[in-house]
């Protein structure tokens, strides 16, 4: 699949006048355990700027003040509050887990709680350290849901068993067959590609100026935001355009910047989406 103007406009459409925040999806973001609090903040900033209607963050209690200082638009709670966690999980259209989650006991419990309670009609985006935790589980034990994986090459190696040198298109497609049907894979590298079944979209955007902390967290937030607000659109197309836009904005910023900060990408998302929707 190729990214062109037609595909972009299939996804990023003008908003209906008679709509409200509930029309654009409810999101639960899980992560940001010490010392990785900034990761979930960047994911949340990207998610809100991408247009998700209601964004709630489950994170360390100590991280909530910092989150609200950067993003008062998001709600937040201590991810150790199990009942509140489950209530927000059940209410979400899209769940993102992994940005700054870590791999300690609390992180493992959070992932287990999500996997045990996610429903078949919900989208689950798995990023960062949650991918490493997921790699330790049997694929046959994964829940039935709309699964989106966003690994870099080393994380995909752990998930698929494919060494980086073996991660060809055909090998990656075969490895993806081990996950439930319809799983979407954002295979991040200097040549990022988005897979679903026999489909693959190679993205000819992005560059080394994106090699900085938080870039993947921002992408995961954008993917989550697009899935939430464009729920009536084909999920694969929504993920492709979110991933493309992330790097297209970076390309533009890099014309006058040696390094592109993830937060600069997030700030630019609304204006880019406005222009692309016209």
Where are the model-predicted features located?
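Small-residue (G/A/S/T)-rich helix-start motifs and N-terminal tracts that mark the onset
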Residues: 1-123, 132-146, 153, 157-278
């Amino acid at each position: 699949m190729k990214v062109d103007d037609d595909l972009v406009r299939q996804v990023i459409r003008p908003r209906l006048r008679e709509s409200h925040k509930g029309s654009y999806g409810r999101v639960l973001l899980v992560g940001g355990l010490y010392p990785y609090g900034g990761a979930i903040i960047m994911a949340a900033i990207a998610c809100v700027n991408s247009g998700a209607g209601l964004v709630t963050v489950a994170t360390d209690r100590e991280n909530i003040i910092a989150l609200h200082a950067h993003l008062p638009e998001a709600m937040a709670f201590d991810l150790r509050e199990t009942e509140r966690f489950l209530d927000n999980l059940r209410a979400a259209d899209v769940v993102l887990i992994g940005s700054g989650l870590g791999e300690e006991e609390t992180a493992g419990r959070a992932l287990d709680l999500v996997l045990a309670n996610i429903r078949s009609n919900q989208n689950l985006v798995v990023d960062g350290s949650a991918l490493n935790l997921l790699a330790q589980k049997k694929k046959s034990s994964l829940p039935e849901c709309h699964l989106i994986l966003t690994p870099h090459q080393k994380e995909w190696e752990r998930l698929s068993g494919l060494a980086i040198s073996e991660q060809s298109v055909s090998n990656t497609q075969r490895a993806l067959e081990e996950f439930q049907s319809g799983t979407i894979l954002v295979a991040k590298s200097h040549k990022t590609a988005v897979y679903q079944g026999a489909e693959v979209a190679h993205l000819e955007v992005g560059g080394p100026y994106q090699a900085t902390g938080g870039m993947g967290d921002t992408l995961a937030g954008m993917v989550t935001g697009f899935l939430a607000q464009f729920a009536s659109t084909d999920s694969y197309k929504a993920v492709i355009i979110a991933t493309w836009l992330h790097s297209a904005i970076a390309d533009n910023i890099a014309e006058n910047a040696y390094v592109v900060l993830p937060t600069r990408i997030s700030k630019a998302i609304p204006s880019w989406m406005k222009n692309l929707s016209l």
